[in-house]
């Protein structure tokens, strides 16, 4: 089972990630990790932090001669901004009397709840660990599982369909063609846009909306469209709640900072339709074998992969750190004040798509390993080929 842990604060010396359970023999390059980190830093509407950091992962263990060796992979991502925070975020020297405590929580952030939960007298520790800066470590961790899946013909990609008031009118005409080529083709096409949208008209309108929000001291959220292609039928299980593939994917997506909603396929649209217009009809036989002509289930039926592209939609709320502040209060005095501003983005939805790609990779990898077993890439590949061949033979005439 692949699992990972991250550590580090936004303004500390570094972020780190440890990935355990990677099979041996997975080919890996520095670009497999660092290219994903670079994608996370892109996107129109990002803040000043992106001008400071150029994220690169230092792999400390678990890889030899360009292949994983089965032991935990440890990675370090240094924070260049640390040099400006050595006093405020010192690990051992006590600079409490030199640093002004932050006691004004921002509405919508972890500030207040984290302050109360952990008994702090200063919000700074909450800000620095709850920050979405932590997702850099998760993208690095997810890139390992992503490389594993890619070598088995499974690809992950995303694009953005909504930013603030701007939505694409319909699914892009090129979507199916991109998915047929693999979800990474979809991601590559989306990456050509500064807002990762596929519709040029929507892109122009979204950029204008971000500019207006920035001028107003406001922020914007949006919707991520995530696809996973090449997933064989039968991953996950209906037998127990904690083995349901859709629930595991939803949990992974919901763990991303500022994500407040998830649906598998067009779930909320499906809820407004009769069943006869929702369920994907089944066909078998002939050269095409088992097939469906629609994918309103989003690639998951009965909490198991159906063999179609898995489609996940994720709603990101607007970032909670506003230049134009909302009402708050001072935790030290309980006096009403305006909330404070912490350096932030106007819109981070394009980056959220990249993070979403990263966090679902270990979920799919684990479902595949549960189905096939194996400790080395060669035996896993062989078992998957046998399984895919058996599926083809079962439904072809």
Swiss-Prot record:
Pathway(s) it belongs to: Metabolic intermediate biosynthesis; chorismate biosynthesis; chorismate from D-erythrose 4-phosphate and phosphoenolpyruvate: step 7/7
Keyword Amino-acid biosynthesis: yes
UniProt cross-references to CDD domains, sorted A to Z: Chorismate_synthase
MF terms (GO), sorted A to Z: chorismate synthase activity; FMN binding
Residues that bind NADP(+): 40, 46
Cofactor note text: Reduced FMN (FMNH(2)).
Chain residues that bind FMN: 129-131, 257-258, 302, 317-321, 343
A GO cellular-component term linked to this record: cytosol
Keywords carried by this UniProt record: Amino-acid biosynthesis, Aromatic amino acid biosynthesis, FAD, Flavoprotein, FMN, Lyase, NADP
The protein's required cofactors: FMNH2
Catalyzed chemical reaction(s): 5-O-(1-carboxyvinyl)-3-phosphoshikimate = chorismate + phosphate
Biological processes per GO annotation: amino acid biosynthetic process; aromatic amino acid family biosynthetic process; chorismate biosynthetic process
Cross-referenced Pfam families: Chorismate_synt
EC number assigned by the record: 4.2.3.5
SUPFAM superfamilies per record: Chorismate synthase, AroC
Keyword Zinc-finger set for record: no
Function text: This reaction introduces a second double bond into the aromatic ring system.
Family note: Belongs to the chorismate synthase family.
Subunit structure: Homotetramer.
Name of this protein: Chorismate synthase
Species this protein is from: Chlorobaculum tepidum (strain ATCC 49652 / DSM 12025 / NBRC 103806 / TLS) (Chlorobium tepidum)
């Amino acid at each position: 089972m692949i699992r990972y842990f991250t550590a580090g604060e936004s303004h500390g010396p570094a972020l780190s990630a440890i990935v355990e359970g990677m099979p041996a023999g997975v080919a890996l390059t520095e670009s497999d990790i660092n290219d994903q980190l670079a994608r996370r830093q892109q996107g129109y509407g990002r803040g000043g932090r992106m001008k400071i950091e150029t994220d690169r992962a230092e792999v400390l263990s678990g890889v030899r001669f360009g292949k994983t060796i089965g032991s935990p992979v440890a990675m370090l991502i240094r924070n260049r901004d640390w040099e400006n925070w050595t006093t405020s975020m010192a690990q051992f020297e006590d600079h409490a009397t030199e640093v002004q405590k932050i006691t004004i929580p921002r509405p919508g952030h972890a500030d207040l709840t984290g302050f109360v939960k952990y008994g702090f007298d200063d919000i700074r520790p909450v800000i620095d660990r709850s920050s979405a800066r932590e997702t850099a470590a998760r993208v690095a961790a997810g890139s390992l599982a992503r490389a594993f899946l890619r070598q088995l013909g499974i690809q992950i990609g995303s694009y953005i369909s909504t930013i603030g008031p701007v939505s694409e009118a319909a699914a892009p005409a090129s979507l199916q063609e991109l998915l047929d080529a693999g979800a990474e083709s979809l991601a590559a096409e989306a990456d050509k846009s500064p807002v990762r949208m596929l519709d040029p008209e929507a892109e122009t309108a979204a950029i204008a909306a971000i500019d207006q929000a920035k001028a107003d001291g406001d922020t914007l959220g949006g919707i991520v469209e995530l696809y996973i292609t090449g997933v064989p039928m039968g991953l996950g299980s209906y037998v127990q709640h904690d083995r349901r593939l859709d629930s595991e994917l939803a949990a992974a997506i919901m763990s991303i900072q500022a994500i407040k909603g998830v649906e598998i396929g067009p779930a909320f649209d499906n809820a407004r339709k009769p069943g006869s217009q929702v369920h994907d009809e089944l066909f078998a036989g002939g050269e095409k074998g088992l097939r469906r002509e629609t994918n309103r289930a989003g690639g998951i039926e009965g909490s198991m992969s159906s063999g179609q592209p898995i489609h996940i939609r994720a709603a990101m709320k607007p970032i909670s750190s506003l230049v134009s502040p909302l009402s708050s209060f001072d935790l030290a005095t309980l006096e009403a004040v305006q909330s404070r501003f912490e350096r932030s983005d106007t819109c981070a939805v394009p980056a959220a798509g990249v993070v979403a790609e990263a966090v679902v990779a270990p979920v799919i990898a684990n479902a595949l390993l549960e189905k096939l077993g194996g400790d080395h890439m060669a035996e896993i590949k062989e078992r998957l080929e046998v399984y895919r061949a058996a599926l083809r033979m079962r439904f072809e005439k």
